[in-house]
Amino acid sequence: MAILEIVKEPAEVLRKKAKPVTKINASIRKLLDDMTETMYAAPGVGLAAPQVGVSKRLIVVDPQDGSGQLYQLINPEIVKAEGWVKGTEGCLSIPGMVGDVWRYEKVQVVALDRTGKKVWIDAEGYLARIFQHEIDHLDGILYTDKCTNLRPVSEDGEEEEEAEVAEVMPEPEAEGAGEPSAEGAGQAAAEAGAEEGEQVTTGVSGERRGSAAAKEE
């Protein structure tokens, strides 16, 4: 495995819609492994192929919540979603900044694993947020397109340390404010009333920490 260079905004590849993977071979599996190594080295909890300069629909995710669960997903797609929650996010491709982003609270992701088997992943809280953030990367969308209160990391370095640790950084106790971003808010309003959810928290003690169950076809 190799540690790859993480490309930074305004790299063009970050704004392209990534191409689906049509053949799973040794090079795809190696890329997944290299992305995993790069994610851990960053360190982060998620990474999408465009972030290492490859415009393919691949993501790797490890919420690092003590479960030991690593997701290496090919052509991931969100097929179900419900609820809204606001959290603070950072991005390895946009260092030094954080912002508040409304996301679905629960999602179901369908994808292929590294062997080509179809998997369904039901995720909520932190894990659901990571999946949404990484899948956005595959469509050329950055969290800054959706966020409010975009800001530099704090001078004391606490936010900076967290932002470097996590591709997605939920804020422990954010105050409720505003509404979901215009993108997708209309649909969410019809489905869930677009009400602000309880804030996702970080750390082992977080009540809304992500959880998931995966099933294979």
Swiss-Prot record:
Q: Which cofactor does it need?
A: Fe(2+)
Q: What is its EC number?
A: 3.5.1.88
Provide an example Pfam family for this protein: Pep_deformylase
Q: Name one GO biological process term.
A: translation
Q: EC top class, in one word? A: hydrolase
Q: Which reaction does it catalyse?
A: N-terminal N-formyl-L-methionyl-[peptide] + H2O = N-terminal L-methionyl-[peptide] + formate
**What's the protein here called?**
Peptide deformylase
